[in-house]
Amino acid sequence: KVDHIAFTGGPETARHIVRNSAENLASTSLELGGKSPFIVFEDADIDSAVNAQVSGIFAATGQSCVAGSRLIISNKIKDAFLSKLAAKAAAVVIGAPDDIATEVGPLCTPAQRDTAVKLIAQSVAVGAVVVSGGAPLKRDGNFFPPTILDCSDAPDAPCLTHEFFGPVLSVLGFDSEEDALSLANDTAFGLASGVFTRDLSRAHRVIRKLRAGIVWVNTYRAVSPMAPFGGHGLSGHGREGGLQAALDYTKVKAVWLRTSDDPIPDPFVMR
């Protein structure tokens, strides 16, 4: 008998697992995908935010559930930010995983590469602009360059909603804090998020309103076994790490222990 199932993967497989777990009502912990927003306000440290964004989306070739795949940036600094980001993306060393100089390796499968090509083409067709990358490299293997798509004029572009599991960043600009939150929460996923600002009060307001299991402020991808890791919506439920993970693997038991030696009175005797 299986009492609990912990799964890391995609929503479709998770649905299959949940349906089958109903046979014996086993509990589940599901760590699924994400389409994580990376919000940069106009007062942010741009150089730090650029470096964090490069790591957030291009590390591990973007094959990460917490990849910061949606850059939501103040229109006041958007052009300057994208200029720096595109330069960093173009300078990334792409190569074989066993080469110590490699910074971005290949995608795991040809299917991932083909999906990226398809989604980028569909996004460009509705108005997205390729800022950097955009097409697989002409070499053996599933190599795909760091890609940046400006979707400011393409709010319905599929690259904004589909998880690539690859090094593809979609960009949207905003004019107000409310706009930023609306764009950030416009997703069926709810795993991770990043917020870059020097305004601590703003950071706390945004933290409260973001629908995400993880919020990183002025950093990205910080992890610890002491911190709960997980999300909600299409990102699943349950947690890895922290006290919450331990609770997911335990059963609650209420115990009442009477210590008095006095006899229990007859409840039906009139007093």
Question: Can you describe what each PLM-predicted range is?
Answer:
Residues 4, 10-154, 217, 264-266, ...:
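ALDH superfamily catalytic-core signature
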Residues 6-7, 195:
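Conserved SAM-binding loop
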Residues 39, 136, 143-271:
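Conserved C-terminal structural/oligomerization subdomain of aldehyde/semialdehyde dehydrogenase
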